[in-house]
Amino acid sequence: MLFRSPDSSVSIYERFTSLYDLMFRFNGYARSIERYLRENPLPTPAGARVLDAGCGTGLLTLALLRVLKRPAEITAVDLSGRSLQTARRAVRKRTHDPRHKISYVRANAVSLPFPDDSFDLVVTSGVLEYLPLSEGLGELARVLAPGGYLFFLPVRPSPATRLLEIMFRFKAHPPRAVAENTQRFFRVIEHYRFPPHEPIGWTKSLVLAQKS
């Protein structure tokens, strides 16, 4: 499998930030993610340290701000400066619990600028498809504290996924590889398939896992 360099990947999202943001704003992905999180609240403590690794234009960050019941410190990380700017603007425009604190960091998801065991919850979407799974998941495991949770949305192979692969120049990992590599670093709690009437289910599934 061919994996793109960080510079190559970020250039794609620098060029297509507006399209990416528009597409995910209107395709119902955000509603589906929020529905799941409201029905299945993440077990985060008050003051939880949360990392959105590869936040893009803020899809998961915004969902967390709306559904987390306890105050949290959210760090949104992306390699694309333009995506971070878009995420920051989106957060400013949305109403959310003012007890949440949020910061933005430009960094590479395979060399995160944080010490080991820095976060209680790590969320990510649209990042691991650009990386060798063992490398990407290993780095997320490194910064996640023991007992902490990983919430991610792997792209699953499908006809709709093939179009996204062409547009955004990534390659979906085989589901078996996702499962095996996740189990190397985490205890899998749930592998969730979205209902077929929700567009997110055409291209993504959801994995919740815990670091031992």
Task: Show which residues each predicted segment covers.
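Class I SAM-dependent methyltransferase SAM/SAH-binding core
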Residues: 51, 57-110
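Conserved class I S-adenosyl-L-methionine
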Residues: 3-44, 59, 63
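A conserved beta-strand element that flanks and buttresses the S-adenosyl-L-methionine
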Residues: 123
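Short alpha-helix
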Residues: 170-185
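A short glycine-rich, Lys/Arg-flanked "PGG" loop and its adjoining helix->strand segment in the class I
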Residues: 135-146
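Conserved beta-strand signature within the Rossmann-like core of class I S-adenosyl-L-methionine
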Residues: 148-154
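Short conserved loop adjoining the S-adenosyl-L-methionine
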Residues: 111-116
